[in-house]
Amino acid sequence: EFLSAYDQGFARVAAVTLPVVPVDPAANAAAIIEQARALAEDGVCLAAFPELCLTGYAIDDLLLSDVLLSDVLAAIETLRAASADLLPALVVGAPLRLGDRLYNCALVIQGGRVRGVAPKSYLPTYREFYEKRHFAPGDALPAGVESIELPGVRSGSDGAERTESADGSGDTEPVARVPFGANLLFEVEDVPGLTFHVEVCEDMWVPVPPSSLAALAGATVLVNLSGSPITVGRAEDRELLARSSSARGLAAYVYAAAGQGESSTDLAWDGQTLVYENGELLGTTERFPDGPRATVVDVDIEGLRAERLRQGTFADNARTLSSPVAGGPAPATTFTDPAAFRRIRISAADLAAPRTDIGLRRRVDRFPFVPDDPARLAQDCYEAYNIQVAALVQRLGAIGNPKIVIGVSGGLDSTHALIVAARAMDRLGRPRSDIHAITMPGFATSAGTRRNAEDLAVGLGCTFEELDIRATATQMLTEMGHPYGEYARTGVLPEGASERELYDVTFENVQAGLRTDFLFRIANHRGGIVLGTGDLSELALGWCTFGVGDQMAHYGVNAGIPKTLIQHLIRWVVAEELFDDAVGRTLLSILDTEISPELVPAEAGGAIQSTQAKIGPYALQDFT
């Protein structure tokens, strides 16, 4: 289905925070189910809730209560039963007993089954945290432990389950046996590429988080259930860690923190939720909310997989960690070896993603190369401009500091290349007169662009010259038998010729080719290099004259800059006052000029030739 986000490689996920009732698993399970039903209606296939959300995080020694732990199992069974007719895989937090140890766990519940349980690996016991008072670390499970039994919880029709007498009375109850460990990967068959891993709060804060290895093992979505009481500045720390994890892991990072309802005896809670994808924030909710909140976004699973293919070092890292170190032992645990992860398959029969038009829940930038945030845009412009300047400085120094020969038209690209060249000369301590700025009027050059070209070159202190190409172009067109040759001689269209034939692609390319030819010969004569002006948008579209034309130069400073960004770069140069006021006024005049190759004359009173009328808006071209 073309309009289905899932069929286009996306997966809808949610990070949820909601009010908890401390020490009341039944009430909390009911609240989770209510949210899960709403998320199912929204097409969500994976929903993460906060750490210990079935009991509340800040309940201290009540975590060790047998009554509470029994109520937790009953609440898990309630969630399991409710999940049978719900779409999303639910990831919820709860304390679970294994033998004589208690673990801080994340349970994955979906399709009427508890799919797996991931214990928290790293327990903070510093400052306001003292989790080792209650819990055992999940990175040190007893030898051979790979599953956990959940008394009173059913496994579903195809799960491992037995019955036992809970109190010796002879009455029996179901006991589900489910995978247990921090090395679980959950593969969603109906969403190609969606494999998720779960870690808990502090696991994100250690130098080598379990999620990093999970990503190397194939997880594309990394889930973190968090308690994380709020202190001043901690929200920024979470964002930094989630962003970093998603960027290094080439994955999505889904983060849900505890909020309303948690005890404020000595702690406070903000209920922050975040989803990052490959270092970019997809969504977040307000902090300190009144009531439940969910960050619901569509993760580009297909894009993440493609990025991993492009970045070969990602697979190299997984291979290195999975291989023995020379002279040392082979990796032995999940925490050193991505290959040690276990995969749990969620079949298409159990989780069938909607194949209907559910819209797209992610922000799509209209201008992908131009940030909306003014501060970020200014930073990008600063970096882009100085990258160009530094690169040109290096190139000039490496080839003996030749002069620069550049064709200036009064358009955006040649303007930007010229102000890059001017700054490069300043950095090198050379006079700007070593820049030979040559304008070459053709058959359609307007007075405005001709004036802007001269004002800019002279204002910058360049060596400015005019070389009119019309006579040479006319001679070439005449000698090759082009209709324009006879028209130029007689002023009358040749018999049978149309104006379209007169101003055809040959007419245009003769002018473009002559300009480039002159520039190269002038550079030869004066000991210079031709500085190319074509931008990334033109190169991507092939919107240039190939061979002897504007496709060719000795060095192209604009080749990595899209057209939509060049306009902002020039505005940034004006705003930063890098040049004097007269140059600034000329730059603003150039920005107000229609983008045109000026190769075909306008009819009397008609509009000038427009590039965007021919190839479409650059805003659209740069977007695609």
Language model: regions and residue ranges:
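Enzyme catalytic cores with a strong preference for nitrogen-chemistry domains
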Residues: 1-405, 423-432, 464
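ATP/NTP-dependent adenylation/nucleotidyl-transfer catalytic domains that generate, transfer
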Residues: 28, 161-166, 192-195, 249-251, ...
